[in-house]
Structures are given as C-alpha cells and as structure tokens.
Curated annotation (Swiss-Prot):
It is found in: Cytoplasm. This is Holo-[acyl-carrier-protein] synthase. GO terms for cellular component: cytoplasm. Mg(2+) binds at D8, E57. Transfers the 4'-phosphopantetheine moiety from coenzyme A to a Ser of acyl-carrier-protein. The lineage of its organism: Bacteria, Pseudomonadati, Pseudomonadota, Alphaproteobacteria, Hyphomicrobiales. The keyword Secreted does not apply. Keywords: Cytoplasm, Fatty acid biosynthesis, Fatty acid metabolism, Lipid biosynthesis, Lipid metabolism, Magnesium, Metal-binding, Transferase. GO terms for biological process: fatty acid biosynthetic process. Gene3D superfamilies: 4'-phosphopantetheinyl transferase domain. It comes from Xanthobacter autotrophicus (strain ATCC BAA-1158 / Py2). Its cofactor is Mg(2+).
Amino acid sequence: MIIGIGSDFSDARRIARSIERFGDRFLDRVFTPGERRKADQRKLRAETYAKRFAAKEACSKALGTGLSHGVFWRDMEVVNLPSGQPTLMLTGGAARRLAALVPDGYEPHIHLSLTDEGPLTAAYVIISAVPKTGV
C-alpha cells in the first residue's frame, strides 16, 4: 500500500550560490557526512547536491510533514543500494514519523527516482508499506 508520495525540483545554480554564500554552514545543515563525501568526489558537485536536496524535500512531503514537526534535513540521507539504485535512509524525526505511518505487521519501503537536465534536478519519492515476511 502507498503511504506517501512526494516530488520536488531543484536548480543546481541556486545550490551553487548557497554553497558560495554560506559554505560549510549550509552544507553541514542540509547534508550528511556521507552525502558530502560523495558530492565532493563528483565533477558536477552542485548538481549532485541539488539532486540530494530535491530528494530530501520530496521525502519530507511523502512523510506528510515537510521540514517541520521534528523532521530535519540531516534525518534523511540519500544512499545507494548495492545495485546502485538510490534510496533514502531515515534517522531521527524522519524515522519516527515513518514508523508512525506504517501499520502494524508491515514494513516501509522507500522508492526514490532522481533525474536531471542541465542545472535542473527532480526527485520523486514513494513510500509504501508491505507485509512483513514471516508474520
């Protein structure tokens, strides 16, 4: 069953301006150390950050809270499965909100799609609940 859907667009030029203006203060507030390591290794650094920014916004919408009610930027981390597929790992307030949305006997699955065209990036998040195996 689908629990939540969220989408967001971001502009890498805007992210680049925020990095220029605020530097580490912006990066530390929004991105996890793992996300920073990955982005800082990429040639298209601002685009990498922009995709992750959009993913976090989309996830917060799918959670039904936006970036409020105890859900913070760094509670959501874009990670890759062994296959390379992106997904989100939630901690803190985002993880608590997700747990509150999932019915007993079910477990959450977060589906993330990222795309970009030039400086524009988009992210789509679908949070679903599937029956736990062995229950």
